[in-house]
Amino acid sequence: MCIRDRCKYHGLEVVVYDQVESNPKDYNVMDAVSLYNSEKCDSFISIGGGSAHDACKGARISVAHDGRNVNEFEGFNKSENPKNPPHIAVSTTAGTGSETSWAYVITDTTTDPDKPHKYVAFDDAAVTTLAIDDPVLYYDCPVAFTAQCGFDVLAHASEPYVSRLNFPPSMGNALHAVRMTARHLRE
């Protein structure tokens, strides 16, 4: 039984938006916002990896601000309304850690349509209400996809070590994460 069927079994109404692309675009987010509003939804569940979670974070920030364009929230803590709808993030891959982060990455296709650019928004209001990371959900992933996610983990794990904004605890955690990833990625 899939997650949607389980929700329906327990009496929850479910509306699905399944058009999120890798490296989610602003129009993915705004389409999700339109669906959310037209169906009178009251919460979000994102299922997947970083792209699904990031798009959902952007959508919930936009919904909390009466559907303002997600690109208006690029930068640090640009949202003014902390009363976002609840967001449950269910991970089916392990790569970005988006399900537990205050950051989300969106591709802006509207500011300069000839040169879309990715940006990061950091917002306390983007932190998910609940993150579900059940390794059982990863078992059905193809080996090649799991390896790609592992390299994504490795890239994200090394970022705090090489960042100019690092500090000793972040460097230690980064090194530990790199070692763990290297050890387990071989398996």
What are these regions (language model features)?
Residues 16-40:
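Helix-loop module immediately N-terminal to the HCX5R catalytic loop
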Residues 6-13:
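Short helix-loop-beta junction
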Residues 41-57, 92-99:
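Glycine/serine-rich anion-binding loops at beta->alpha junctions
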Residues 1-3:
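Short, small-residue-biased leader/transition segments that mark boundaries at the very start
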Residues 31-33, 52-65, 100-101:
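Short Gly/Thr/Asp-enriched flexible loops that form oxyanion-binding sites at enzyme active sites
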Residues 65-168:
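A glycine/threonine-rich phosphate-anchoring loop and its flanking beta-alpha core
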Residues 38, 59, 77:
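N-terminal loops that bind phosphate or other acidic moieties
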Residues 160-187:
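Active-site segments that bind and position negatively charged phosphate/pyrophosphate groups
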